[in-house]
Amino acid sequence: DIFFVRSGYLISNIIISDINNGKFKFRHFYLRRIRRILPALFSTIILSVPFAYILLQPKGLLEFSRSLISSVFFYSNLYFRNLDFYNSSSAKTMPLLHTWSLGIEEQFYIIFPIIFLIFFKKFRNNSAFIFFAILLFSILLNGTNQTDDKFYYIQFRLWEFMLGVLIM
């Protein structure tokens, strides 16, 4: 959870710094994220593939392949949420299970700069209230949902990112 708070803080800080210096560009923002995240993700995947091939049974290998695709396209949080753990391999045989949080984070990185710039430019003096409202909405949403959705879907995690944004 603190990981998402930290990300909200860092990303909003980077965006504001770039705006204040007159050098924010979406392209540069996303290229920096790609250079920071993809090498570690692809290293993990490259190291996992041979072990998965050697150690997993056909059903587990199929699940691994699906989780690999979902990890590369940053929707592993949705993939693992919809996975039937009762009929699937053990979590111990899912080497990319930890990428659920990367999926949430990347979804935030894709959406947040656009929303942030809209609110920051139009409502600069009131943007903190808007981000606080998003934080409250996410907390209320958590209170109304008693399923695993709270763990895997970004709307239930937004309060953590927004807390980081508001700390900034």
Feature locations, PLM:
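Membrane-interface helix/loop caps of multi-pass membrane proteins
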Residues: D1-M168
